[in-house]
Amino acid sequence: KELNWNIDLDDFDEIDDITYDFDAADIGLKEEAFAKITSLRQLQPLCDEQKWGIFCVEFDSNKFEVSALRKILSGLIPKRRNAAEHAVWSQKDLLFLCFWGTDNNRTIGIAHFEDKDTGLPQIKMISCAPAVEDFTQIRTFEDRIGHLSWVKNVTDTQAWYDQWSSAFVTAYHQVIRDSASLTVKLAAEAQAIRDRILDIYAVETHDGYVHKLFKDFKDNLIHDMTKQQFADMYAQTVVYGLFSARCMDKTQDSFNVKEAIACIPNTNPFLKRLMEECLGESSERHLTFDELEVANVVEILTHTNTDLILADFNRQTGGGREDPVIHFYEEFLTAYDKAQKVQRGVYYTPQPVVNFIVRAVDSILKTEFGLADGLASEETKTVKYMREKLKGQGMTEDTKEVPKVQILDPATGTGTFLRQTILQIYDNFRAKHKGESEEQIRKVWNEYVPKHLLPRLNGFELMMAPYAVAHMKLAMVLKDTGYDFGGDHRLNVFLTNSLEEAGKDDFQMTLFDNDPLAFESIEANQAKKNNGINVIIGNPPYSGESANKGKWIMDLMEDYKKEPGGKIKLQERNPKWLNDDYVKFIRYAQTFIEQCNAGIIAFITPNKYMENSTFRGMRWKLATLFDMIYLVYLHGNSKVV
């Protein structure tokens, strides 16, 4: 009555006279789709001009069941392929009056799908639980449903839509100008996305989107991943990926789904494809609406002045002397999950140590390998490789020209070593072009990067969140050097497990036809087979009880499980310390050096293998393989009280 809807209060005594009752079959769904639904009724049209479909949904639950509503929605909108045999509506023309909870604690919610120019429709909800909410909250609810009053001119469908949809408009009115405020908001959204993923997983079928995505990551990346770990990893990646895109955006006055995807550099095609799928911009759309409410993150970032945020980073990190991206990630993890920040401290390596290692590698390349430009060298060499014969009749040996210096960080983490490597290469490059104008240096640098930098720089990382951080960090440092990201040249930093053998190049795309992880896996396999890599740097993980026990890496480890001389099995009852992850990474790096017959390994490691008798076979192997071994003792095993 207050909203001027053409319904008499007496009509509610005979509810069947003003509504149509629906079951699962009526809208082309299976019975299990209604598992959380007590009833679904459509309010009969109140005038001939009404385009809106108004439905009443009673949930058998104490909370709003967004996944159950998704299933209803899928039966009420037009099918992409086969026409439905019942009435259908555009998503924006549907209004759901939802009820859930117990008799003493009932909640009424009104849901609408906001129409967007780009991306997935986003669910908008206003709700009220009169038994538990105070007068102010109830008054706010009443004010907002006031927008749902019946329009005077029912023939003006656009005005009708504008009025009703205005009931659901919410916005961040204040521009975010400092990193502390932004990290709190983004961390809260990441937590919400993580929880929504778990909620969806709990109610959807095995062929649902989240189930398929989770299975794909387990099959091809981390085989013992739990759904909690998956939800956590995915949520962080989405939030940090969008933040990365916003930081690369050249405009401060606008930001939307299309811009977010466009601003993800071509150097990271995996994240670009993942965001296209997540935000509904891929050619193969698999989501009906923004069920994870990722658009909330886009909205926050729309009202974020990233120029001020980045200036705030630099102020807090001594004018950029420290890594501002790591600084933000640490703040983000503190707000998101303090325990996880402690657990993930392994990703952070002190910048002075990183600087020293990268400079040392650059110096050795110049003095011992005779490469005047060090890490920036453009020199090439001829290598042998096996290729398929032209008519497919077996394999044959061939040769090709490859760069003399190719770098790999097999435990990339957040990309600290690769960032410093780029900076060192840039310093060497500028020194070589000393005396030229800034315009000329920038021009030649933009020619150098896709031809001589990106193809030589490689990184492997197992966890998706630091992987996204690494790509953001490296894109930003390239941007700072003046690189304009022309072309489709990617950064060879891949989401993969270094300690697993390279698979076949004809990787079967298991999730969707345009599966981002499938493309990433194919390219990671090709990078793993690169027999030209000869500089391996980084800070591999330390884990006495390593989970990396695949046959391929364990077979390689047999090299270190022999007595000096390499013929007799190591006479140790329990050589378990040889199975530490960092030892496996040293052995992994050794394979590249053996393939090239020359190279450098520069790792930060524990010092056990230098003295402990269990490692005598490993020490002998390294001493016979390498001409020079430099050990810098940092007293990392000392305890500071």
State where each predicted segment sits.
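Non-catalytic, well-ordered alpha-helical scaffold segments
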Residues: 94, 184, 191, 211, ...
